[in-house]
Amino acid sequence: RVLVASPALLAKMGHPDTPDALTDYPFAAVSGVFASNRIQLIASEDQLINVPVNIQFQSTHWRSVLSWLLAGHAIGVLQSPVCRKEMADGALIPLLSHYPIPPFSTWLLHPPAGMMSYETRICASLLEGYLRDLLLEPAG
């Protein structure tokens, strides 16, 4: 996951230089992800800090949040794979890179191994490999 903003928003408001500065920026979020109006960042020595944010836009889908960020309306957090191209093109700029966002864990729920069909095992194996490769690619 990565905290990003568009160059247009940063030209208008400047770059946040500390986690506390994030409250000065409008924030776009996927509904329910930052329900407490706070985001977690990793500070030095892997210490988690909770930082308040000013949520101005919420959507049930990340694509709407991405569009809002690209339009320069807010800063926000997205999964790295969904905005990798925009970051490479310079349409989104990572913020506070020395305070990374903790990753989400990914889980596959399935019946006990003895009850899992061959097709489900193959699908789970392919999905695991695909996601591992996708999520390990560098974000910026």
Regions found by a protein language model. Name each.
Residues 1, 9-10, 65, 83:
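A generic structural signal for short hydrophobic patches within well-formed alpha-helices
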Residues 1-5, 21-23, 98-104:
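Short Pro/Gly-enriched coil loops immediately N-terminal to beta-strands
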